[in-house]
Amino acid sequence: MIIFTLRRLLLLLVTLFFLTFIGFSLSYFTPHAPLQGASLWNAWVFWFNGLLHWDFGVSSINGQLISEQLKEVFPATMELCILAFGFALMVGIPVGMLAGVTRSKWPDRFISALALLGFSIPVFWLALLLTLFFSLTLGWLPVSGRFDLLYEVKPVTGFAIIDAWISDSPWRDEMVMSAIRHMVLPVLTLSVAPTTEVIRLMRISTIEVYDQNYVKAAATRGLSRFTILRRHVLHNALPPVIPRLGLQFSTMLTLAMITEMVFSWPGLGRWLIHAIRQQDYAAISAGVMVIGSLVIVVNVISDILGAMANPLKHKEWYALR
């Protein structure tokens, strides 16, 4: 396990190193780039040294430090993605197992059809439909933002629910509920695609495990179906799925950009899209580095967790994964 982890960490460092060239190219080769006046080597050394000190320069639009802007928008995106990913796991794992154990029966067909429908719906269209129904028609949920305009929450961690909870305001409970209400539609929109993919992965893995002889032997010993599912099926069906969850989280970061634009969520994706529109290359470079690094780190962590859950993966060569 130690060798496997070291290989993954080495792959992480090498990939991050090559990612720096992409980020640097946006600060050097683009028109009116901030580092264009220096030589290529000196510009890269200066840029990389700033990267190590979390210094991405200043925005060419408003003159603010990009690192300070990232501190404001990055937690908002992470809060949205973590909640959506958690919802996808809580729903996708049991529903996928149900589809697997009822293979070719009506529950499996219904779940598979519903998952296919959810996967095929465009994110922006789903967001508009949910907004039209729950916000504009029923008036149950807010349309945009993180809090109601009545509340002023001091940002401490950048996570809306946590900041509202640790606030010393007499309206703390109301602020927490306001934060939750503002998150319902963005989280629901963002969680649909990963939920359907988790359902598909768990269904395939459950079918493979359910046909194994040790599961049939457990049934002949008189164990209940719930015990078989909990002890044997879930324990063996989940490890092959874990390494693929990192890819789903990475995909969700891309979908978060669209979700943040529709719901005016002040996150990293919305900030990066505005930077692209305004041709703020220093901000674009910083956004690419942060998102790319997060994607790489999440995938490496998912591989390590998958290997810990499935010891047979320890001996696989990382270049073949």
Curated annotation (Swiss-Prot):
Membrane topology of this protein: Multi-pass membrane protein
Keywords: Cell inner membrane, Cell membrane, Membrane, Peptide transport, Protein transport, Transmembrane, Transmembrane helix, Transport
Gene induction: Part of the sapA-sapB-sapC-sapD-sapF operon, RNA detected in mid-log phase cells.
Chief place where the protein resides: membrane
Location relative to the cell: Cell inner membrane
Residue intervals passing through the bilayer: 9-29, 81-101, 114-134, 175-195, 249-269, 281-301
Coiled-coil ranges (or none): none
GO cellular component: plasma membrane
Stretches of the chain found on the membrane's Periplasmic side: 30-80, 135-174, 270-280
InterPro entries for the chain: MetI-like, MetI-like_sf
Pfam families: BPD_transp_1
Cytoplasmic membrane side: 1-8, 102-113, 196-248, 302-321
Molecular function (Gene Ontology), one example: dipeptide transmembrane transporter activity
Function: Involved in a peptide intake transport system that plays a role in the resistance to antimicrobial peptides.
Family according to the record: Belongs to the binding-protein-dependent transport system permease family. OppBC subfamily.
ABC transmembrane type-1 domain mapped to chain residues: 74-302
Organism this protein belongs to: Salmonella typhimurium (strain LT2 / SGSC1412 / ATCC 700720)
Annotated GO biological process: protein transport
Protein name: Peptide transport system permease protein SapB
